[in-house]
Amino acid sequence: PYRWYLKYIKKFHGKDMFFSSYGTFMHKLIELYHKGEKTPRQLVDMYLQDFKTEVVGRAPNRKVFSSYFTGGLQYLKTLQPFPYDVVGVEKKVDFVVNGIPFVGYIDFLGRKDDDLYVVDNKSRILKPRSSRAKPTKADEELDAYLRQLYIYSAAVEEEYGKTPKSLCFN
């Protein structure tokens, strides 16, 4: 998405806002889990202790704040390992597509039975496609997330010589 482009390609780091700092905080916690450094219980404790200092900016309203806070807490309480061996967590990839340089961070790259899997952690629930003739904002957002996964698959193919078997959201 555009925010990813600004952050990783243009190296623009604007003022942290609620949604971006929430996503950054959740990714940091999930990374600790997949690297084997923290248990879900430890992550819950960190979440409760650090939420106020890590998640800056204001949510649009109390309902949104409550939804994100409780959703993140529930997510961390129910974390399960992926059915893949770990190849990389927050794996940095530098690559070129059609002459355009990209830098990205694959949330989780796994291997099972010699196949590769790219997993993109989402710290909130994604809405399914609407099937409307004219795409909704949620449809366009989902398309942007999917494009990011396909771009990452190009980086994986460049480095490992094979395309991932699956591109997944978690």
Question: Language-model segments: which ranges?
Answer:
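Active-site oxyanion-binding pockets that recognize sulfate/phosphate
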Residues: 16, 57-62, 135-142
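Generic recognition of stable, solvent-exposed alpha-helical segments in well-folded globular domains
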Residues: 21-25, 67, 144-147, 151
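Nuclease catalytic cores
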Residues: 1-36, 90
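Mg2+/Mn2+-dependent nuclease catalytic core
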Residues: 87, 91-170
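Short amphipathic alpha-helical segments and their helix-coil junctions
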Residues: 1-13, 46-55, 118, 126-134
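Residue-level signal for well-ordered alpha-helical scaffold segments within enzymatic catalytic domains
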Residues: 4-7, 28, 32, 74, ...
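A non-catalytic, helix-rich entry segment at domain boundaries
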Residues: 25-92, 96
